[in-house]
Structures are given as C-alpha cells and as structure tokens.
C-alpha cells in the first residue's frame, strides 16, 4: 500500500532512481494506492546526465508493493520492495527497459507497453 510520502524504487532505465509519492491520481479521498494505480511523484534521486533530474515532478505507475496481493486463483504474491515505472501523460513508459518482475494485473489495466518490456510477469 502506497500513500503520500512513501518512497519507491524506480523499475526502469529512465534515469530516476528513487521517487516519493505526492498524490494518487483518480482518487480524491483514497488513502492508499495499489499495483496498477497511477501516482504523482517527485524524483528524490537521479542518475547524472539523464533527461530526468532531481526534484522533478513525474507520473508513475506502481508495479510492485510489499503489501500482499491476492489473485483470483487464490495465490498471494508479495514483493521485496515498492517499485514504480515512470510514464508520460499518455501512459507510455519513459524508459526503454523494465527491471524485475511485475504483476500480471498491469496487463488487465491496459499497460501492455510496460508488460512487454518486463523480463518476468507474475
């Protein structure tokens, strides 16, 4: 469960390394965001000489959370970290690679571009 002020790892090669959640998109009074939700975040740590800089406000979609995720077939999935992929206004990823496993719920939420870049879909 991601709430404002939560720090997340970045699971792509967009240039950002760490994000901090500011707001959950599409929810005026929702407290937590889950896998597949879009958030507004600020970049807390970035690689030098990349297009994204520190303290820049970006949109990101959550791909992994430490909170357990119950699937329809009864399987419970829990990841080791909270991670997100930086996206643009149209929902396309800014990076060209995605690191680590992502949840299959992203395919159902029409983030097919992110799913196709991921090495493993759980």
Curated annotation (Swiss-Prot):
One of its GO terms (biological process) is translation. GO terms for cellular component: chloroplast; cytosolic large ribosomal subunit. Signal peptide: none annotated. The keyword Transmembrane does not apply. GO terms for molecular function: large ribosomal subunit rRNA binding; structural constituent of ribosome. Keywords: Chloroplast, Plastid, Ribonucleoprotein, Ribosomal protein, RNA-binding, rRNA-binding. It is found in: Plastid, Chloroplast. InterPro entries: Ribosomal_uL14, Ribosomal_uL14_bac-type, Ribosomal_uL14_CS, Ribosomal_uL14_sf. It comes from the Eukaryota. Pfam families: Ribosomal_L14 (PF00238). Binds to 23S rRNA. PANTHER family: 50S/60S RIBOSOMAL PROTEIN L14/L23, LARGE RIBOSOMAL SUBUNIT PROTEIN UL14M. Part of the 50S ribosomal subunit. Belongs to the universal ribosomal protein uL14 family. This is Large ribosomal subunit protein uL14c.
